[in-house]
């Protein structure tokens, strides 16, 4: 569905009976509940093109929407002091940042230093490059690298983590890469930032992982999809480009069902993302409005 086929607020004002309300799918209703997202965050990759031209101005627009937290995906040449200043000016905090896989070796000490200087809690690796994923041993190698990075990060008073896409949920040599990472990574050194949209698009239930690995998921990426795609291992590499992403709440993912398990999962940070929004500011505004009103 698109932006919602029925305007919820208008419908609830005009509907004459409770029976009419019951006809709406449950995920479309902001039914009263005791739980909510206290601080909605956003991955700044969503507004990356705007950030290139106006770093400070774009962050100000993010704050004006109502966001309280941001996750970085690059600093566009700014120093740690400059980044910290723009966050403070706009009443924002950054709990996390994304750093590339090839930055986890010789460059990692400087990554840690910068991250600590802007008061980050988490350093997240968001992706393992496609060429490396052709190696059947990559997931064991990645787990070893993540554990080492986790040790360094922990010594600096922060936490290391990994962000998934879709390919971690497709069998490799008879095993799921995501399962291998969870088994091989030290739970105290490596946490998971689960991208709830990507895992859902593979037909995998995130709640299953919350139940099996409680407390391992302090951060989640929250984005939506208009329709659930079909995926096969043969088309895995280009799968991401075929997914029709949309603003949170205007797609088909049942957020109430997932968030009902937030406590067991250990979720502390809910981070909005849209990989290819046509109108980035309008996109993150729509997602913010939905999440800020959501109750479960």
Map each language-model feature to its residues.
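Acidic/histidine-rich catalytic cores of soluble enzymes
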Residues: 155-252
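Acidic-and-aromatic substrate-binding clefts and catalytic sites of carbohydrate-active enzymes
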Residues: 48-52, 71-81, 100-107, 130-134, ...
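Acidic (Asp/Glu)-rich catalytic clusters
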Residues: 35, 60-64, 78-94, 109-120, ...
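Short, acidic/polar
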Residues: 50-61, 105-114, 203-209, 255
């Amino acid at each position: 569905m698109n932006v919602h086929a029925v305007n919820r607020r208008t419908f609830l004002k005009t509907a004459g009976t409770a029976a009419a309300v019951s006809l709406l799918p449950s995920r479309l209703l902001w039914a009263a509940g005791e739980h909510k997202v206290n601080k909605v965050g956003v991955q700044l990759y969503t507004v990356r093109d705007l950030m290139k031209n106006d770093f400070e101005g774009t962050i100000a627009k993010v704050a004006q929407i109502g966001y309280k937290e941001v996750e970085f995906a690059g600093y566009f040449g700014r120093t740690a002091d400059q980044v910290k200043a723009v966050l403070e000016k706009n009443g924002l905090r950054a709990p996390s940042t994304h750093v590339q896989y090839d930055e986890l070796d010789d460059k990692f000490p400087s990554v840690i230093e910068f991250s600590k200087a802007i008061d980050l809690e988490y350093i997240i690796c968001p992706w393992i490059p496609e060429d490396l994923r052709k190696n059947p041993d990559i997931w064991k190698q990645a787990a070893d690298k993540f554990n080492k990075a986790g040790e360094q990060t922990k010594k600096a008073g922060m936490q290391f983590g990994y962000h998934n896409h879709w390919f971690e949920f497709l069998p490799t040599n008879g095993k799921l890469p995501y399962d291998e990472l969870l088994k091989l990574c030290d739970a105290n050194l490596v946490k998971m930032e689960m991208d709830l949209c990507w895992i859902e698009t593979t037909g995998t239930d995130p709640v299953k992982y919350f139940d099996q690995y409680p407390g391992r998921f302090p951060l989640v990426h929250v984005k939506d999809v208009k329709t659930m795609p079909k995926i096969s291992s043969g088309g895995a590499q280009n799968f991401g480009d075929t997914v029709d992403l949309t603003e949170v709440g205007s797609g088909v993912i049942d957020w109430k069902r997932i968030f009902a398990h937030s406590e067991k999962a250990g979720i502390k940070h809910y981070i909005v993302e849209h990989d290819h929004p046509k109108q980035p500011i309008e996109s993150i505004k729509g997602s913010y409005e939905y999440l800020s009103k959501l109750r479960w």
